[in-house]
Amino acid sequence: MREILFKYLPENAVTSCFELIKANNIYLRIVNERKTRHGDYRQLPNGQHLITMNATANKYRFLITFIHEVAHLIAFERFGRLIKPHGNEWKYTFQ
């Protein structure tokens, strides 16, 4: 997984992002670029977390989108599933 991350992330961000993936039991799926979204988070029925990310040549876009989706995961775990996707709880977490 680390080797794959080097293709999509700035080199200095790979270790931190890899640690986030391990610590939060994230299944990261990199897909062909979609026009409607850069990334997506959802919790699977088995409790594992799925983050789907567009494959992009822009490593900084990938990084910001990854952090954005991890913030959804953490906000939902801390505050429950009934919060608004980009509400105050998510904004607090994304900081």
Predicted feature locations:
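Active-site-proximal or metal-binding-adjacent scaffold patches in catalytic folds
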Residues: 1-64, 73-95
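Walker B catalytic acidic pair
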Residues: 69
